[in-house]
Amino acid sequence: MDEYYQVHNINEAINALTDESKPFPPALLYTFSDLNADDIRILKAAWPSLPLMRRRTLLEDLIDMAERDNLMMFEEVGKIALEDEDADVLVSAIDLLFQAEDSRLIPTFLRLLQNASLNERVRAAAANALGPYVYLGEVEKIRPELLQNIVEVLLNIYANDLSDLVRRRVLESLGYSSHAAVPELLRAAYFRPEVAWQESAMFAMGKSADDQWQSFVLANLEHE
């Protein structure tokens, strides 16, 4: 009976998403938490045919709900949405997965970041999502070779990419890294004239375990 109830609910939610003539019932948002294998299969098959605005607003609503209730687990929806082609959907999917701490997501985030044909907001979101995995690598919670791969890609993107937004998000994620190249990158960004770069440098310094940045952070706080 429980299995039928779950399948019935996911189908009800999908039908409600498909019917744009009626508002989507907020109570059905709970259906997308803790999806079982059948739910995942059904939603994945239906996802491409869901109206674009419904896909966008669904993810936005799930992000809001997850922020208000940490018992809600929408990671499987986020993983399905990572295969979407819409930039807004992709950004929201990445945001929904930001705290997943699932190393299986690393290749996908790296692929999105390195795809120069994608919207820069998608690539910036992917760069941002890699930050927690740099931290996990530094505290030895993921394999060293995974950390090395992430940092090498981030450094390469930072050195060669044309998007300032992407490069700033890369710098912020590199703040967690103990790589020898990072301190000079942070220092150079901090002394750039653009406020956005200064803010990214400060954000990265705040993530760093390197004590040399303490004076920079304190000076900025006093200035504010």
Give residue spans per PLM region:
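Structural detector for internal amphipathic alpha-helices that build alpha-solenoid repeat scaffolds
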Residues: N15-L35, A45-P48, R56-D69, I80, ...
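Core helices of alpha-solenoid repeat scaffolds
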Residues: N36-I40, L71-E75, L105-I106, R143-V151, ...
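Short amphipathic alpha-helical interaction elements located at domain edges
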Residues: Y5-H8, M53-R54, V77
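Short N-terminal helix-initiation segments at or just after the protein's N-terminus
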Residues: M1-V7, S21-A27, F74, D95-Q99, ...
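Alpha-solenoid HEAT/Armadillo-like helical repeat scaffolds in large eukaryotic proteins
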Residues: A16, I42-L50, V77-E85, T108-L118, ...
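N-terminal leader/linker segments that initiate helical-solenoid repeat arrays
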Residues: D2-P23, A37-R41
